[in-house]
Every structure is written in C-alpha cells, then in structure tokens.
Swiss-Prot record:
SUPFAM superfamilies the record matches: Xylose isomerase-like
Regions crossing the membrane: none
HAMAP family given in the database record: UPF0276
Lineage: Bacteria, Pseudomonadati, Pseudomonadota, Gammaproteobacteria, Alteromonadales
InterPro entries noted in UniProt: MbnB/TglH/ChrH, Xyl_isomerase-like_sf
Coiled coil regions in record: none
Domain of life according to the entry: Bacteria
UniProt record similarity statement: Belongs to the UPF0276 family.
Protein name per UniProt: UPF0276 protein Ssed_2857
C-alpha cells in the first residue's frame, strides 16, 4: 500500500479506554491538539503514551495564533516541541488564522488577505520552525467575513505557502463551507491549491445554519458534496493521508469506522492515483 494511502482519526479523551484495549486496523494514525494533551498525567497520560507507541501521531494546534498581532508565545512553542520530542511526533500543523490580540479569543479569526499579512505570517513561520526544529504545516481555514481583503483567499493561501516555503494541510470541508458562505466554486478553489505543497488532508462534517450559511462544527456526518470534493481532490492532487475530524456529537466507533472505510475505498478506487502520489 502506498505510504500516502493512509487514514487517520482525531483522538478524543473518551476514546482512550477503547483504543488502548484494541485499536482498529483501519486507523493508520491519530491526530491530537497538543494543547489538550500536554499537561495530562495519571491514567490519561499513561494511556496516551501507550497509544503513541502503537500508532503514528500528528499534532494539529489550536492556539499558536500564527497571524496574530501579538508577539509569538515563545514558551508555548517550546512546550509544543518538548511534547513532540517526548512522544516522537514529527508532524505539526496549525490554522492559517489568529486567536489572540488584546487577550485570547477562544475562536479562530481570519487574517486579512493582504500582502502585509503574508509577510507577517512568513516571519512568524520561520520563528516557529527554528524553535520546533520541524516544518510548520498550515491549514486553510473556514471563515465568515474577510476584513480588509486586498486579494482572494486562494491568492493569500498560495502567497503564504510560497513565501514561507511551507506545506499545506488541505481541509476539504473548509473549502466546501467557504464556497457556500462566500459563493465561489469549490472545485475551482481546490484546483488552485499547489499539489507539491500538500502534506495531508482533513475531512469533516458541518452544520447548516441556513441555506447560504454553513458552520464548520466537526459535529456531524460528512455529506455527499464533501465526499465528492474529496474524490476530486484525489483525482487532481493524488492520494494523500486523510484525517477524519469528529469533535462533537461523537457516534459509536463503528459509525466512525464506516466513514474511515469510505475514505480508504476512495483512496484505492483508482490505482493510478496511488502511483501518482507515491
């Protein structure tokens, strides 16, 4: 099997008992938000260590605030490095957004799509990478307003990736959510992403607030148009490791495995896709 044809699951604490007893073979890797696990001790800490010795892990951060106006929290980045070193984790991704300004905002805010913002992010990416001694992977995010935009979303994302020389966590559901909320063509946006910079993918469900407003919740099953966009992604960019996010309304593992199996099926549907990404 191609190293790219892997499927992962976002790990939640309530899954620890079950997965420490038996980890399904269909789950090739796990992803965690390090902020939620760095200070764990006791039973949870022991269980987490057990799983990291059994399966590969990725880290997907929540509060680096790579585009924020405040100085980077250097100690926080050092703590992330120590956590990753302890558990032998090499992959770290973060949202191309910010969550701090005057205080910490417990949400991910959009960065203005400007050249000034591009250069601001690029400088901070280099700082983070120097401390982590690892590449920083950036994720395209869902957003509900674009303040002060001087370029389009895909122009901004591409500019940051190019100037920072970093890789992309391509979130397929975020593309769909933004395409509905901001009235653009999801397939066209998907095709504008640089294949050579894609590290891995996210896919998730969302909540339809209204006909023209979708909220990225990670709390529902994946819908048909998002599945179709994932297939298109494999057809355009080749197969990449793909992570199922489910943060709320978590169903029984059997239902999560149904979606994981569906991703595996798409990854293996066209053999030429595997050879292209190998």
């Amino acid at each position: 099997m191609s190293e790219q044809a892997k499927v992962g699951l976002g790990l939640r604490r309530e899954m620890l008992d079950e997965f420490c007893d038996s980890t399904p073979d269909a789950i090739d890797f796990f992803e965690v938000a390090p902020e939620n696990w760095m200070t764990l001790g006791g039973k949870f800490g022991r269980q987490f260590k057990q799983l990291t010795e059994r399966k590969p892990f990725f880290c997907h951060g929540l509060s680096l605030s790579i585009g924020g106006p405040s100085p980077l929290d250097i100690q926080f980045v050092k703590d992330i490095k120590a956590f990753m070193d302890l558990h032998n984790i090499s992959t770290y991704s973060e949202h191309l957004s910010y969550c701090s300004g005057t205080g910490h905002m417990y949400d991910l805010m959009p960065i203005p799509f400007t050249q000034e913002a591009v250069m601001h992010v690029v400088k901070r990416v280099k700082q983070v990478e120097d401390i982590l001694e690892r590449p920083l992977i950036l994720e395209n995010v869902s957003f509900y307003a674009a303040p002060g935009a001087e370029m389009t979303e895909f122009e901004f994302v591409n500019a940051v990736l190019s100037e920072a020389d970093c890789r992309l966590l391509l979130d397929v559901n975020n593309i769909y959510v933004n395409s509905v909320n901001h009235h653009y063509d999801a397939s066209q946006f998907l095709g504008s992403m640089p294949t050579e910079r894609i590290a891995y993918l996210h896919i998730a469900g969302h909540y339809e607030e209204a006909e023209d407003l979708i909220v990225d919740t990670h709390g529902a099953d994946i819908i048909s148009p998002v599945w179709q966009l994932l297939r298109e992604c494999y057809e355009i960019h080749g197969v990449h490791p793909t992570l199922l996010e489910r943060d709320f309304n978590i169903p029984p593992t059997s239902e999560l495995l149904n979606e994981i199996d569906q991703i595996h099926e798409y990854q293996h549907a066209v053999p030429s896709l595997l050879s292209r990404s190998a």
